[in-house]
C-alpha cells in the first residue's frame, strides 16, 4: 500500500499549485469561448441581462463577490418566495454567471494536465499514432482476442451521486486551496439554487449545463479508478499505460507498446496472473468490457471485487446488477453502435484413408458485427428525417437553403453514417438508411418547390444517387458506371474498418447514447 501511495504522489507531484489568479485573466475566457461555446448560452445575446454576448473577468469578479457575501443565499431564497418572477430572474443571473465561472475554471485546471501530457510524450519519446485514434481501431482487437475468451462482463461504470466526491479526487491532484474552496462553494450554491427551482439531482443538472467541467472531473475519476485497478499489472511489466495522459482527449489512443519486459523480482506465478493475455479490459463512453478465458466463478470474483472497490475507495454504493456476466458463445453485446457476437459455425469434413472413410465435425469461431436497425431508425427520427416507423419525411427547417446545399447536407450525413457503420456484416440496415435519407431529401426539395418527390427523383436520378455514395463508391462509379449495382451487391458486403474516424457524427453519437 505504501508503494502504491508513492506512485500516486509521484504522478501528482507535477501539478501546479497556484491556479486561482488565472481566474481573473481575460484570455482564459477567450480560450473558453473559442473552444466551442458557440452552441451554449454565451452564443445567444443576453439582452435581458443588460450585456451582449461578450463576457469577461469582470462578470466573474461580481459573481465571486456576491457568492461570498453574508446571507446572500438567504436573501435570494426570500426573493423567490416573495416574487416568483424575480426569483426565476435571479436564478437566470446565477445560472449565467456560474456557467462562465465553470467554463473558465475548466480551462484553468486542464492546463497542468495538458503540460503533463506534452512532457510525458517528450520524455518517453512516444510517437503519436493517428491510426489508433480511430474508434474503429478497437474492433480488429476484439476480432483477434474475443475468439479465445469464454466469459464477458458488461460493466456500466457508476458515477458518484454527489459532486463533492469528484472534487475530493481533484483535491489530491491540485494543491491550490483557494481554487478548491471556490469550486466547492460554487457547487454548494448551485445545488441550493437547483433544489429550489428544479426538482432534480444536482449532479444531473450540473452535467447538462456545465459539460466541460463535469467531463473533466468525471475523467479524473475514471483515471483514478483505472489506475488503481491496473496497478499490479503496471508493476509486473514495463508496459506503461498512458491513458491517464490522454485524459483530456478521451477517445484518443496512443501507441502503448514498444518493448515488453518483466521485472525479475516477481515470481512466475504472480507474473502469470498479471500477464495472462486472456484477460482484457476495454472502456468507452461510461461503459467497459472485461473478458476472460476463465470460469464463471472467476468472473463473479471480479464482479464483487469491483463493487467493494467502488464502495470502500470512492465511498459510494454501486449496484451489482450494473455488472452483467454472460457466456460469450450465447451472448451478443452492444458496443460503439454495433451488436457484436462470436458465432460458432459447424462444418462436416469427409476424410478418406485407404479403404476407410469417416466424417469430422469441425467447429470454427467468427467475430460478427451487425447494426441494430431500431436504434438507427430512432436516431433518424430524433433528427426529423423519418417517422417512428421509419417512413421518410421532409425536413422543413432546411427548405430555406439552396438546392445544392440541401443535397450536400443529406449526402454528407449519409456518407458519414455509412462510413462509420461499414464494419457491419449485414448491409440491409445501411441500404434502408440510405433509402430513408435519399427520399427525405427528395421530399424536402419537393416541399420547397411545391412539387412531388417523384418528379425530383426522376429529374435528379443519377446526380442525387452520386451524392449518397461514399468516396470508394464514387471512384468505382466513375470508372465502371455499369457495374455499380454488382459492386453494391458483391464486394460491398465485406466488413471494412476505417482508421480515420476521430470524431463521431451527431446522429451516430445519438445512436450510441439512446441504446
UniProtKB/Swiss-Prot annotation:
InterPro entries recorded: Domain_X (IPR024937), Maturase_MatK (IPR002866), Maturase_MatK_N (IPR024942)
Gene Ontology terms describing biological process: mRNA processing; RNA splicing; tRNA processing
Annotated GO CC locations: chloroplast
Pfam family, one: MatK_N
Alphabetical UniProt keywords: Chloroplast, mRNA processing, Plastid, RNA-binding, tRNA processing
Predominant cellular place of this UniProt entry's protein: plastid
Function: Usually encoded in the trnK tRNA gene intron. Probably assists in splicing its own and other chloroplast group II introns.
PANTHER family named in the record: MATURASE K
Name of this chain's protein: Maturase K
Amino acid at each position: 500500500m505504501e508503494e502504491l501511495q508513492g506512485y500516486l504522489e509521484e504522478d501528482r507531484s507535477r501539478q501546479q499549485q497556484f491556479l486561482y489568479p488565472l481566474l481573473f485573466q481575460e484570455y482564459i475566457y477567450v480560450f473558453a469561448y473559442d473552444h466551442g461555446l458557440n452552441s451554449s448560452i454565451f452564443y445567444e445575446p443576453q439582452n435581458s441581462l443588460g450585456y451582449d454576448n461578450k463576457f469577461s473577468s469582470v462578470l466573474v469578479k461580481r459573481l465571486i463577490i456576491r457568492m461570498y457575501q453574508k446571507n446572500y443565499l438567504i436573501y435570494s431564497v426570500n426573493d423567490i418566495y416573495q416574487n416568483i418572477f424575480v426569483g426565476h430572474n435571479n436564478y437566470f443571473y446565477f445560472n449565467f454567471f456560474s456557467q462562465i465561472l465553470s467554463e473558465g475554471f475548466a480551462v484553468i485546471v486542464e492546463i497542468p494536465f495538458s503540460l503533463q501530457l506534452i512532457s510525458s510524450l517528450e520524455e518517453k519519446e512516444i510517437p503519436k499514432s493517428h491510426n489508433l485514434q480511430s474508434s474503429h481501431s478497437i474492433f480488429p482487437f476484439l476480432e483477434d482476442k474475443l475468439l479465445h475468451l469464454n466469459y464477458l462482463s458488461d460493466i456500466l461504470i457508476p458515477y458518484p451521486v454527489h459532486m463533492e466526491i469528484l472534487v475530493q479526487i481533484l483535491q489530491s491532484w491540485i494543491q491550490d486551496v483557494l481554487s478548491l474552496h471556490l469550486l466547492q462553494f460554487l457547487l454548494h450554491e448551485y445545488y441550493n439554487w437547483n433544489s429550489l427551482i428544479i426538482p432534480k439531482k444536482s449532479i444531473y443538472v450540473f452535467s447538462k449545463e456545465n459539460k466541460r467541467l463535469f467531463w473533466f472531473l468525471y475523467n479524473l475519476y475514471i483515471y483514478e479508478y483505472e489506475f488503481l485497478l491496473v496497478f499490479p499489472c503496471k508493476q509486473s511489466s514495463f508496459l506503461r499505460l498512458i491513458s491517464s495522459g490522454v485524459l483530456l482527449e478521451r477517445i484518443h489512443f496512443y501507441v502503448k507498446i514498444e518493448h515488453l519486459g518483466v521485472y525479475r523480482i516477481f515470481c512466475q506465478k504472480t507474473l502469470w496472473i498479471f500477464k495472462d493475455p486472456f484477460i482484457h479490459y476495454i472502456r468507452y463512453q461510461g461503459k467497459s468490457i472485461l473478458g476472460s478465458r476463465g470460469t464463471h466463478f472467476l468472473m463473479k470474483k471480479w464482479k464483487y471485487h469491483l463493487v467493494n472497490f467502488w464502495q470502500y475507495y470512492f465511498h459510494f454504493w454501486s449496484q451489482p446488477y450494473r455488472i452483467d456476466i454472460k457466456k460469450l458463445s450465447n451472448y451478443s453485446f452492444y458496443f460503439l453502435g454495433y451488436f457484436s457476437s462470436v458465432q460458432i459455425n459447424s462444418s462436416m469434413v469427409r476424410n478418406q484413408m485407404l479403404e476407410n472413410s469417416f466424417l469430422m465435425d469441425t467447429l470454427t469461431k467468427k467475430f460478427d458485427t451487425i447494426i441494430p436497425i431500431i436504434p438507427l431508425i430512432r436516431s433518424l427520427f430524433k433528427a426529423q428525417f423519418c417517422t417512428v416507423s421509419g417512413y421518410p419525411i421532409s425536413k422543413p427547417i432546411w427548405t430555406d437553403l439552396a438546392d445544392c446545399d440541401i443535397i450536400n447536407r443529406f449526402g454528407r450525413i449519409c456518407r458519414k453514417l455509412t462510413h462509420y457503420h461499414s464494419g457491419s456484416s449485414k448491409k440491409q440496415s445501411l441500404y434502408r438508411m440510405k433509402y430513408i435519407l435519399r427520399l427525405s431529401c427528395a421530399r424536402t426539395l419537393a416541399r420547397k418547390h411545391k412539387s412531388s418527390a417523384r418528379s425530383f427523383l426522376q429529374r435528379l436520378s443519377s446526380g442525387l444517387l452520386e451524392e449518397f455514395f461514399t468516396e470508394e463508391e464514387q471512384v468505382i462509379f466513375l470508372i465502371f458506371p455499369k457495374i455499380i449495382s454488382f459492386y453494391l451487391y458483391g464486394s460491398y458486403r465485406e466488413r471494412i474498418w476505417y482508421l480515420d474516424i476521430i470524431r463521431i457524427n451527431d446522429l451516430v453519437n445519438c445512436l450510441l447514447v439512446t441504446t
